[in-house]
């Protein structure tokens, strides 16, 4: 089954690097500039996975995206720690990865889709 991945990152250049990396997981990868844009897109198209920067989204927004749209979330941050990782997982995220850890992000997505 083809999956659609949406990337919301604080740095547009980083977002484009993640798009290139995510192409190994899915041919359908898009970027958005805000949580509002992501919600609008998800209301029109089936989005299976969001790769979301914790500098731009709250844990409550992550929980809301999971509840409202069923989107699997991989959080990213420039310096995630154990407390942030635990909080992200409690909010429903699959994982919380360093923002530049494309292999880890891809692995989290692939493990979720295989389950």
Whereabouts are the PLM-identified features?
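Conserved acidic segment of CheY-like receiver
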Residues: 2-12, 18-22, 50-51
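Conserved phosphotransfer microenvironments
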Residues: 15, 48-69, 80-84
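Short hydrophobic/Thr-rich beta-strand motif most characteristic of the beta2 strand and flanking loop
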Residues: 26-34
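Acidic, metal-coordinating helix/loop segments flanking the phosphotransfer/catalytic sites
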Residues: 33-49, 56
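Conserved phosphotransfer cores of two-component systems
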Residues: 43-45, 65-71, 91
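Two-component signal transduction core modules
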Residues: 50, 73, 96-97
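Alpha4 helix (beta4-alpha4-beta5 surface) of REC/receiver domains from two-component response regulators
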Residues: 77-97
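Receiver (REC) domain switch/output surface
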Residues: 105-115
């Amino acid at each position: 089954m083809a999956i659609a991945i949406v990337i919301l990152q604080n740095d547009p250049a980083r977002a484009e690097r993640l798009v290139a990396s995510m192409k190994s997981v899915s041919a359908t990868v898009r970027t958005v500039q805000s949580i509002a844009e992501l919600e609008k897109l998800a209301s029109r198209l089936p989005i299976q996975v969001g790769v979301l920067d914790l500098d731009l989204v709250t844990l409550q927004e992550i929980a809301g995206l999971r509840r409202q749209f069923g989107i699997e979330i991989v959080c990213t941050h420039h310096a995630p720690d154990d407390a942030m990782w635990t909080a992200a997982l409690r909010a429903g995220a699959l994982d919380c990865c360093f923002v530049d850890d494309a292999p880890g992000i891809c692995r989290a997505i692939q493990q979720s889709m295989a389950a």
